[in-house]
Amino acid sequence: NETHVDALAVSIGTTHGQFKSKAKINYELLKELKAKLGPVGLVLHGGTGVSDEDMKRCVREGMKKINVGTELNKNYIEVVSKTFTADDVTPLTSLRNLLGPANERIKEIVIDKASLFKL
């Protein structure tokens, strides 16, 4: 409270990037941090790969922002790669047509994640 920060990224068991092993979120530490930091918005870095249930619980326990940039990047690149290598792509193909499917995929993911944060 003395620092007057709006948000603080905390380490409670996740890391940047996507990993094959399941994140082991330390909920006791999250509760303790929330109790000590009061109104400061807590941020979870490394939300990519965190299960939907864990995300919901993090929000219930006080997390205000969850970063999932790696998931967004991965999906965007996958869709762009498929679109750019399609048989009907020519040098005259509009960028809107090439990037539109990737933008739609990101929109779907963001809507899905936002639904997890509504409790």
Where do the model's predicted regions map?
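C-terminal alpha-helical cap/extension of soluble enzyme domains
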Residues: 51-119
